[in-house]
Amino acid sequence: MIALLRWGIARPSAPLRWSRCFATSTEKGDEGWQTVIGLEIHAQIKTGKKLFSKASTSYGHVPNTNVDVHDAAFPGTLPVLDINAIRLSIMTALALNCQINPRSTFDRKHYFYHDIPASYQITQHYNPLAWNGHLEIREGDNGSKRTFNIGIKQLQVEQDTAKSQTVGDAVLVDLNRAGTGLMEIVTDPDMRSPEEAGAFVKKLQGLLRRVGSADGDMEKGNLRVDVNVSVHRPGMPFGTRCEIKNINSVRFLQAAIESERQRHIAHYCTSPLEPLAQETRGFNELTLQTYSLRSKEEATDYRYMPDHNLPAIIIDDGYLDSLWKNLPEMPWQSVERLVKTYGVTKRDAETLLGLDEYSAQGIAYFEEVVEQDKKIAKKATNWIAHELLGQLGKAIRPWTPTIVPAPLMHELVTAVESREITGTTGKAIVKHFVSLPESASLPPSFAELLAELGLTPSAASVEDLTETCKKAMNNQPKAVADFKKGNEKVVMRLVGEVMKLSGGKADAMKAKDILLDLLKD
């Protein structure tokens, strides 16, 4: 269970320590430099309402319509904590292998700006919800060249700010986002390349969606990334750290890191005696370069203090155990299991995973199609990931598990594999399903479906198939001549002609055998 108690003595946390190093003026290029990267990620919690009020968090509404009196900081209003936001945050922390703080508290971070109506933000400075976790990055993830763990320093729950926009001399403020619950996830500076940072963000997005705690949509601002970058010579202390704020895509994250990395190296190579200024920087998406926002040489005094209006959060072991048992299979675990159990490729497994990142319907659909018959697993993957999704792509239609019901897809795959129907017939069936409206009723059995479409397997005799093969040879004299000259691959062109003449009903393998016999006579 989660219990809420009045706040007590707060425990300050120790800040990360970063130091500087310098290069000599004779050093050229970026070889021999090591980049150090740490991330601060803000993910909006997917509860449908704000952290301390009942206002909606729906995206795209008219400005200043999703606002409660507490979000606008009306005097006398009190925060009411959404316990579901805490539950989802704890599940995220468990998935990140974090230690859960048995007693966490809320604090006020004071500053004056347009986007903070109360002039303070409710956060967790002294006693965060969780800490000391990690997320493993595998070699090959987003181009990562090593397998390693990225440490999670802490996960804390806090309020999001409003949006503000400067128009001429005026500043327009939209309070729709103000008060939305955020998980702030702070990593240790364990990443050494833009690709590793991108791999972490991508993996975290999948984790958040599978847990159900956040959408992780960077384009909508549901997930925002601040990145800290420094460079140094191997074996030397870390260089001066600069922070790049509010990056909204993985591609831009990697470009921002590379731009900042090159800027630091250029400074140390050209001005080795001049300290690099510690700054907060922005990122220009057009030039793919960072630019200075403000100096960070002096730490801002936010005058943190415990929030008297909010009780402490007390979490017992029994509640944690129940959440741990209900954690879903993580995306990378699903991919590994499919590869190991069914022998499918990692790429195809990731394609199935991508059909539904939230509840893994694509993987459940695949396993229902296979019905524990590992012999057809690879073929089933081909039919789903390539044929079905290919047809859906042409029709500009999203995948759902009802377009081709799993039992019918299972019968289709097994029928093709047992040569009851041809691959051409199977493709025609898939195309038929894709063309049907969602409300269309389906035949009760696979046999009736074939009959309805006029695709019932032909019971033609060997003699009939031989006659069809002879017609195909007459229609393709050049292919016959090429075969006689030693080009045996052209037999497949003749098989295609047989399938065309038979309306796709002929057995392609039998047709090939007969054609080879006829061609060698």
Swiss-Prot record:
- Top-rank taxon of the source lineage equals Eukaryota
Among InterPro entries, the record links this protein to:
Asn/Gln-tRNA_amidoTrfase_suB/E (IPR017959), Asn/Gln-tRNA_Trfase_suB/E_cat (IPR006075), Asn/Gln_amidotransferase (IPR018027), Asn/Gln_tRNA_amidoTrase-B-like (IPR003789), GatB (IPR004413), GatB_Yqey_C_2 (IPR023168), Gln-tRNA_amidoTrfase_suB_CS (IPR017958), Gln_synth/guanido_kin_cat_dom (IPR014746)
How is the subunit organization of this protein annotated in UniProt? Subunit of the heterotrimeric GatCAB amidotransferase (AdT) complex, composed of A, B and C subunits.
Reactions the enzyme catalyzes:
L-glutamyl-tRNA(Gln) + L-glutamine + ATP + H2O = L-glutaminyl-tRNA(Gln) + L-glutamate + ADP + phosphate + H(+)
Biological process terms in GO annotation: glutaminyl-tRNAGln biosynthesis via transamidation; mitochondrial translation
Q: Which Gene3D superfamilies match?
A: 1.10.10.410
Give the range of the organelle targeting sequence. 1-22
What is the enzyme's main class? ligase
Localisation per UniProt entry: Mitochondrion
Name the UniProt key words of this record, in alphabetical order. Answer: ATP-binding, Ligase, Mitochondrion, Nucleotide-binding, Protein biosynthesis, Transit peptide
What Enzyme Commission number(s) apply to this enzyme? 6.3.5.-
Cytoplasm among keywords: no
This one is known as Glutamyl-tRNA(Gln) amidotransferase subunit B, mitochondrial
Q: Briefly state the protein's biological role.
A: Allows the formation of correctly charged Gln-tRNA(Gln) through the transamidation of misacylated Glu-tRNA(Gln) in the mitochondria. The reaction takes place in the presence of glutamine and ATP through an activated gamma-phospho-Glu-tRNA(Gln).
State the family named in the UniProt similarity comment for this chain.
Belongs to the GatB/GatE family. GatB subfamily.
Kindly list the GO CC terms recorded for this protein. Answer: glutamyl-tRNA(Gln) amidotransferase complex; mitochondrion
NCBIfam families, per this entry?
gatB, PRK05477.1-2, PRK05477.1-4
Q: Which GO terms describe its molecular function?
A: ATP binding; glutaminyl-tRNA synthase (glutamine-hydrolyzing) activity
Nucleotide-binding among keywords? yes
* Matches recorded under SMART domains: GatB_Yqey (SM00845)
